[in-house]
Structures are given as structure tokens and as C-alpha cells.
């Protein structure tokens, strides 16, 4: 009797171990009860079906990159034109000296103004007389009166109203400032100013031309 009891107990223990092994196969981690999962039920899938890797919500697919719009050509052209206009204003010139003179009447007046306001000593230091002559010629071409100075060196302001062909100029001239308000220039006026201004530039180039061995190229 005692031997049969031992055999029955051993069989029960073996059966219990086998059942436990089948319920928890090797390699399976115990499930945490902190995930809100009821024991005995599988946890819900966290990823879409067919996805085996975590999803990066910040990733951009190649297809989306190809669909990204290119900068508008109109916007690019507008920004380019604004940049060029800023450069022109910074250089004090809004015209092309190589263009036909009849196409740049406003530009010629602006060129004259920039040139007239410059100190001759900073333009052609070694030839101030040439610079003065060029400025005088430009004054005559546009009909501007030359500024007068008193013996004490103080500038004497003049207010003149000059009619020059198809141009009426009202200007307030002082030693450091001239503010003309010209109307439309005739073709002859523009060509004269253009010619004189180009001659003035040629004089400057001749003065500052680089030399090689003491000889101008």
C-alpha cells in the first residue's frame, strides 16, 4: 500500500510539471499586468498590420519629397529684380551708359547730379583743372548756373529759373547741394550730356590707368 501511494504521488507531480511547461513554453516572457491587459489575453498590436518596425512620424518618404513644390519662377524673378534695384540705388546709377542716349534721359540727369556733387579733389586729385572744366561743360549743357562764392568762402545761394530748349530747370544751388527738378529733355540735350559725361569718364581712366615699367598701357 505504501509503495502504491509513492508511485501515485510521483505520477501526479510529473503530470503537474508537464502541464506547467506546456502552459509557459521556453523563451516566452511573463506578461506585465501594468499594461492594462487581462491575464490570459494577448496584448493589442501597437503597429499597423504588416509593419514590423516602429513608425517614425517625422520621417518623409521619397514620394513626398518628390511632390514638394519648387519655388515659383515669378517669385524668384521678383526677388532678383528687387536685389538688382537695390544694387543700382547703392551705386547711384539706374541706367546703362552703353545704352543709346535717347533711352536714358532720366539717367543722364542723375549721372550729372552724382558727378556734380562729388568733390573734384576726390575724383582726379592730380588734374583738378580737368575735372572743373568737365563739370563746367556739364553745367552749360544742362543750362545750370555756376555757384558763386563770397570772399569769405561762404556759399551764396542762388535761385534761378532757366529755360533751355524743351527743358525748364528750377534749382537751388549752394556749395554742397543742388536740387533740380527737370522736365523732359530733348534728344539733343540728352546726347550732349551723354557725350560730355563719357568724355569725363575717359579722362578719369587716363589719369588712373595702370602702368607697367613707368609706361601706360
Swiss-Prot record:
It is found in: Secreted; Host nucleus; Host cytoplasm. Residues 22-52 are annotated as: Disordered. Keywords: Host cytoplasm, Host nucleus, Secreted, Signal, Virulence. One of its GO terms (cellular component) is host cell nucleus. The keyword Secreted applies. A motif (RxLR-dEER) lies at residues 46-67. Residues 1-23 form the signal peptide. Its main location: secreted. The RxLR-dEER motif acts to carry the protein into the host cell cytoplasm through binding to cell surface phosphatidylinositol-3-phosphate. Secreted effector that completely suppresses the host cell death induced by cell death-inducing proteins. Belongs to the RxLR effector family. This is Secreted RxLR effector protein 147. The lineage of its organism: Eukaryota, Sar, Stramenopiles, Oomycota, Peronosporales.
Amino acid at each position: 500500500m505504501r509503495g502504491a501511494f509513492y508511485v501515485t504521488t510521483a505520477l501526479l507531480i510529473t503530470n503537474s510539471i508537464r502541464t506547467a511547461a506546456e502552459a509557459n513554453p521556453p523563451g516566452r516572457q511573463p506578461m506585465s499586468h501594468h499594461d492594462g491587459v487581462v491575464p490570459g489575453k494577448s496584448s493589442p498590436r501597437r503597429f499597423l498590420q504588416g509593419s514590423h518596425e516602429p513608425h517614425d512620424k517625422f520621417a518623409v518618404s521619397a514620394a513626398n519629397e518628390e511632390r514638394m513644390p519648387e519655388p515659383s519662377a515669378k517669385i524668384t524673378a521678383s526677388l532678383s529684380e528687387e536685389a538688382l534695384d537695390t544694387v543700382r540705388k547703392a551705386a547711384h546709377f539706374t541706367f546703362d551708359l552703353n545704352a543709346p542716349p535717347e533711352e536714358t534721359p532720366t539717367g543722364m540727369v542723375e549721372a550729372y547730379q552724382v558727378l556734380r556733387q562729388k568733390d573734384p579733389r576726390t575724383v582726379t586729385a592730380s588734374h583738378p583743372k580737368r575735372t572743373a572744366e568737365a563739370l563746367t561743360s556739364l553745367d552749360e549743357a544742362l543750362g545750370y548756373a555756376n555757384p558763386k562764392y563770397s570772399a569769405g568762402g561762404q556759399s551764396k545761394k542762388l535761385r534761378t529759373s532757366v529755360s533751355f530748349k524743351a527743358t525748364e530747370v528750377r534749382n537751388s544751388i549752394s556749395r554742397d547741394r543742388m536740387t533740380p527738378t527737370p522736365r523732359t529733355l530733348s534728344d539733343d540735350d540728352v546726347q550732349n550730356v551723354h557725350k560730355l559725361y563719357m568724355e569725363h569718364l575717359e579722362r578719369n581712366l587716363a589719369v588712373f590707368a595702370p602702368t607697367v615699367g613707368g609706361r601706360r598701357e
